[in-house]
């Protein structure tokens, strides 16, 4: 039997504007999700027919269980959430089950869209990666999470339409709604979505004016007493739309930082912003090596932001020169952001300070990070503007 997380949906189907509704047909995988990939229509559960008007997310067993457990945990935290707020969150009418045999339609695009998921598991017979030819022999390694089908994502809406003033106002209103009405309620209950971005906001098929937040695969909840740091935060992958300070949530980084400061103190070297910068610079280099994709996305955003502004003022206007300038701008911004956090939440580093040096990462998480990580996510929608060519916008003169 499927595991179910249901509440009755009393909404009435209304005639909708097709530009908000994803009209593709078939069972093919069509979008990557956090730690999994999504199929439309839903994949059948073992012993059950496919559910109409549902989609399926295929995940490795451990990730499926974590995501489903967190959806249940978050739902229990949000029992008193106003209906006018919860309508923006896809948390109800969700089930987890064993996947039935995948049909030829289900296998379309599976290696392209689900490649990141399939490569994590080896086929029992060949010991090679799972692919379209052998996945049906390895379904015991996967679960599916079935959820109500929604319309087109905000990302695709922006990608598929000319952005005129009406569309821009509508997108801005979505961001404002989340910042003012949705995220504060999540913050109060200690819930972090952790992966807010334009592809994870889909328009409701019942009411196209309601942008619904999906994909809770990177979510977590804070401790009830708002002390300490959730264990999950130490293991989740860094996303490009996260605050730059996210990589500080590592026990190794914290231990290295405190050890570095104690060494400076022992050698009677004055601890200043510039001396701490010596520690942060190699951390940034390590971040680039370990998070190449995230780094390249952020660099492209910075490049689009500054490209037109500084090009006219540099003598060497070659691509390599421009790339070096963007690299310097981004690295300086990143390093200074992290420095601000370290300086603000490190105690006993003053010239006359006594006692042990303490970096209070827990205080930073509960006072600041808990409240701004999803804000960074929702504001990342604006990044897409920066990546569009000017011809994408249809603005009256």
State each model region's role:
Residues 34-122:
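ATP-binding glycine-rich loop module of kinase domains
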């Amino acid at each position: 039997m499927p595991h179910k997380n249901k509440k009755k949906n009393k909404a009435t189907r209304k005639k909708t504007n097709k530009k908000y509704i994803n009209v593709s047909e078939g069972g093919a995988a069509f979008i990557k999700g956090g730690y999994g990939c999504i199929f439309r229509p839903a994949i059948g559960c073992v012993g059950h027919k496919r559910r109409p008007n549902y989609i399926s997310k295929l995940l490795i067993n451990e990730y499926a269980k974590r995501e489903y457990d967190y959806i249940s945990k978050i739902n229990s935290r949000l029992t008193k959430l106003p209906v006018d707020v919860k309508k923006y969150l896809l948390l109800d009418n969700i089930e987890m089950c064993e996947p039935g045999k995948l049909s030829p339609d289900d296998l379309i695009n599976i290696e392209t869209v689900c490649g990141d998921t399939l490569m994590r598991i080896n086929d029992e017979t060949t010991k090679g990666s799972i692919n379209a030819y052998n996945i049906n022999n390895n379904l015991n390694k996967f679960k599916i999470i079935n959820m109500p089908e929604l319309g087109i994502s905000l990302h695709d809406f922006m990608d598929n339409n000319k952005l005129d003033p009406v569309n821009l106002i509508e997108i801005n209103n979505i961001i404002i709604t989340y910042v003012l009405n949705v995220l504060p309620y999540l913050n109060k209950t200690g819930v972090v979505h952790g992966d807010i971005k334009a592809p994870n906001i889909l328009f409701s098929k019942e009411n196209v004016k309601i942008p619904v937040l999906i994909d809770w695969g990177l979510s977590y909840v804070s401790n009830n007493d708002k002390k300490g740091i959730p264990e999950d935060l130490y293991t989740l992958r860094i996303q490009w739309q996260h605050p730059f300070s996210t990589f500080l949530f590592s026990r190794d980084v914290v231990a290295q930082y405190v050890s570095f400061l104690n060494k400076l103190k022992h050698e009677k070297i004055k601890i200043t912003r510039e001396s701490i910068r010596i520690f942060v610079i190699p951390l940034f280099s390590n971040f680039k090596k370990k998070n190449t994709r995230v780094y390249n996305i952020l660099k492209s955003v910075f490049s689009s932001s500054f490209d037109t502004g500084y090009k006219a003022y540099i003598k060497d206007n070659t691509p390599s020169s421009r790339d070096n300038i963007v690299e310097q701008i981004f690295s300086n911004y990143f390093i200074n952001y992290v420095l601000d956090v370290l300086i603000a939440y490190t105690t006993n580093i003053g010239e006359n300070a006594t006692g042990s040096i303490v970096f209070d990462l827990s205080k930073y998480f509960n006072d600041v990070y808990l409240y701004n990580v999803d804000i960074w996510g929702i504001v990342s929608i604006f990044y897409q503007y920066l990546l569009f060519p000017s011809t994408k916008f249809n603005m009256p003169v």
